[in-house]
Amino acid sequence: MVKTKAVMAVGTSTVSNLSLPTPIDTAISKAFVTGRFLPQTHIRFQMVPADLCSKSMYLQKDVVVAFRQMKLAAASDGISLRIISGTRNFWEQQAIWERKWKANLAQFGATAKNAREILKYSSMPSSSRHHWGTDIDINNLSPGYFATGRGLKELQWLRKNAIKFGFVEVYSPRESGRITGYEPEAWHWSYSPLSTQYLSFYKQNIAYSDFKGFLGCEWAKDLRIIEDYVSVNLN
């Protein structure tokens, strides 16, 4: 487990219709919010039970509890929910980012345009909300899946009910007026009782000098990653 210094405390509150009190993380650190830790050895994390997910992954324990409650509620309404992606630390995100970076080199070169193309759906290492163990991808990663049929019903249920369990839709449709940040991701939901704490800490403590150690990191400031991608949502 990464040893962290207690640097931030947030007051308690409760999530609407959720029986558990809002978890408070009093040991948030720069290393944590930028993903430089191992979830499998972190005291707040656990492996997600197989009945909740499609593959082996880790999430924060509080997120697992809340998702199980949401999954059960959805099932009672005929809706099936399954986590298909959970925590990705810095090095996992780096692997995804650099694979795409190298694949785009022939077309875009080592340029900001290369980074911007990747940023449509993938975060720079050090800036992904998936670092925090609070954010999950549900059921399918295709925008078209949630536009019709079963996927649309699942999305409608989530938009109506997920907040009762602490989960919020992170990357809202462009029609909502959002012009910065990633493309809409109907599958991406965040456990806001914790993620709001990490987002607040991130905006107060992370600088562009913290973006290092991966291909294309030099473009983070020019592309306003902190302002236009990490900070694009309130939760």
PLM regions with names:
Residues V2-G86, F90-N235:
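Extracytoplasmic cell-surface/polysaccharide-interacting catalytic and binding patches
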